[in-house]
Amino acid sequence: VVTGSGAFNEALIQEPPKLSNRTTILLFLCLLVGFFCQTMNGFDGALFNGLLANTVFLDHFHGSNSGIWAGIVSAMYQIGGVSALPFVGPAIDNWGRRVGMFLGSLLIVLGTIVCGLTITNASVGQFMGGRFMLGFGVSIAAAAGPIYVVETTHPAYRGMVTGYCNTFWFVGSILSSGAVRGAITLQTNQSWQIPIWLQMVFAGLVIGFCWMIPESPRWLYVHGKREKAIETLTKWHGYGNRDSLWVKLQISEYEAHLNVDGSVSFLYSFF
């Protein structure tokens, strides 16, 4: 039995992937949900630095773009991200990649609402709490999204698609900077409210579409849902052919993983 790179090359020769195939195009569209998790990460991570240049924002909270105020408020995002680390593994390994993307995005939406509603009370504590939730949610979504992309992409395009996925962090960062720069000319509270509420856009897209896309076949297989995993691989990678070399290649990889690591345990999710 040919395995490893030999099996990959054999599949590539005998069953060349069909880039223009409708199934391939639909799969690429499904993978955009994982891409958006990276975009959220870039958007949220770059937002606060831009807001510190907005005098209307600083006046609203009686803050400063230097010193302890800026440091503490900014750090709440990172504190939230670090606090989420013990939950990232269990969330995406035990409940699935889609659940991880959903939970992370839901927390981002809630964090955005908490931050946005400070327009009514100028509460720094509330804003910091929202920043904490944003960091917590981004940490989960930014882990689940790329893993989903890697595991669900057709093997022939995995390297290329994964590379493009990483660039979407910069897409989010650029969009964030553009939103802050574009709104700052308003010279009203809308100049900082607009960029903050825009944090919901990509999170909302992930929430709306994550249940319409296939679950990672690798996650399905190693969690005992083998028939469902084979059906997913057959549809999206084998173009309906259950005996496709691409399907067999990945099943052999999943089996090799199980033989080495055994069944997935709860403690395994932390490492």
Identify the function of each model-found stretch.
Residues 1-234, 259-271:
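Transmembrane-helix signature of 12-pass secondary carriers
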Residues 236-248:
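Short intracellular "coupling" helices and adjacent cytoplasmic loop segments at the cytosolic face
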Residues 247-260:
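Cytosol/matrix-facing amphipathic helices and coiled-coil assembly/linker segments
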